[in-house]
Amino acid sequence: MRGSSWLCLTQLGSLLLLALAASTSAGAEIQAADCARAAKYSESKRGASMLVMQNGRTIFEHHYANGGSAGGRWPIFSGTKSFWGIAALAAARDGLFKLDDPVSDTITEWKNNPRKSQITIRELLNQTDGIEGASRLQRPSIRDRNAMAIRLSAVAEPESAFIYGPSHLQIFSELLRRKLKGRDVIGYFEARVSNRLGLGGLNYKKDARGNPLPATGFELTAREWARLGELLLGRGSYHGRQIVPAALLREAFAGSHVNPSYGLTFWLNQPAPTAREADMERMLDLHWQDAQWTNVCICKDAPADMVVGLGSGYQRLFVIPSLEAIIVRQGSSARFSDARFLRLVLGRIQ
């Protein structure tokens, strides 16, 4: 099932889950005492910072530990991807493309490839395009990541597998560069996304050609990362300014049939509460052919409308629309459980 048919079904399912989450969670207040217990757990797992906001106000901020500080930026690693996902939606709003356009309309080198010619922009963003993940793209010695990315092999048919890696957004970066016709990709990102969120001095990990590495690189304070959460809760609006239309933003929260727990650069909790809880980072350590992404969730006791920005080492931005809540957790690699942490924050562990 490709493109629009699957999208219609997943959007309908998403709306039903949102309604259910709203009916079961409306009015629920996160308690500072529960947050303190979660912070203690996080700190014991090398947590550096924690921030909880609800209904537009800060209700808990961790007394920073393990090298963290309120004003010190911390690597969010793959949490970077979600910012570029917002940039993709902004570009769609600007009319540069439609999400279901074939990539080969722009990257014409793919026209005669039986697999690559079928790939859509949406499939780049939800990592179901079948292109190898190519973690080697992150090496700083590569002179032109975009050129390398578009030459990568398609190891599976489009929409037949979820293959996580930096390749997909690197290809998107090249597509956006061509669509901008001489305008700078980073300049576009800053004008449409980061400047509007008040974020400057970002590390784009540029290669020798000036191409950004959209898969990773940003360093943010907990408060800065929470601004992306405010944008999501604002249905694409931040401090009264619409960055992406609400209807387009909803498309980012629709999973694919091969991985219902991943949308357009955002992780999803939609399969909860009946799904199997999984540590997404450990799942990503598996070879793509060995990972089973159907019927998994981040936390069965968290609302099904929760969306997540996820970075290595358990960097997390949890956004729960039904609770009007934003939860940021930053730290160093350790054996950390998202599910336990969320149960503590939400008061589901007595």
Where in the sequence are the language-model features?
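Bacterial N-terminal signal peptides
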Residues: T10-A21
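Active-site SXXK
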Residues: G56, W74-D100, L124, F172-L176, ...
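Short, charged, amphipathic alpha-helices and their helix-cap/turn boundaries
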Residues: T58-H62, S104-D105, A134-P158, Y164, ...
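Conserved catalytic neighborhood of penicillin-recognizing serine enzymes
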Residues: W110-R139, R151-S160, S167-Q170, L220-R223
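Active-site-proximal alpha-helical segments within enzyme catalytic domains
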Residues: I171-L175, G217-S237, Q315-R329
